[in-house]
């Protein structure tokens, strides 16, 4: 149930603000797609943690490029 909520929030981001704002993704796949895949694969707790860590790495001094879900 919590996993579905996390996925719903990530999809809402993809369909809402992400469409209006200029593309600034540093990673492939995007953080929202990464979080959706992580929660689908590992569940709400571990997948949510992986998504949170990924979002925290998304800043000008962080990495970039291809970063798949482990």
Swiss-Prot record:
UniProt keyword list: Cell inner membrane, Cell membrane, Membrane
Locations listed in the record: Cell inner membrane
Keyword Membrane applies: yes
Keyword Membrane attached: yes
GO cellular component: plasma membrane
Highest taxon of the lineage: Bacteria
Cited InterPro entries: Membr_insert_effic_factor_YidD
Function text: Could be involved in insertion of integral membrane proteins into the membrane.
Family: Belongs to the UPF0161 family.
Protein name: Putative membrane protein insertion efficiency factor
Organism for this UniProt entry: Rhizorhabdus wittichii (strain DSM 6014 / CCUG 31198 / JCM 15750 / NBRC 105917 / EY 4224 / RW1) (Sphingomonas wittichii)
């Amino acid at each position: 149930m919590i996993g579905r909520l996390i996925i719903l929030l990530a999809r809402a981001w993809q369909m809402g603000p992400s469409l209006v704002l200029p593309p600034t993704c540093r990673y492939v796949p995007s953080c929202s797609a990464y979080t959706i895949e992580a929660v689908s694969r590992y569940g709400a707790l571990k997948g949510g943690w992986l998504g949170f860590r990924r979002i925290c790495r998304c800043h000008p001094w962080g990495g970039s490029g291809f970063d798949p879900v482990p």
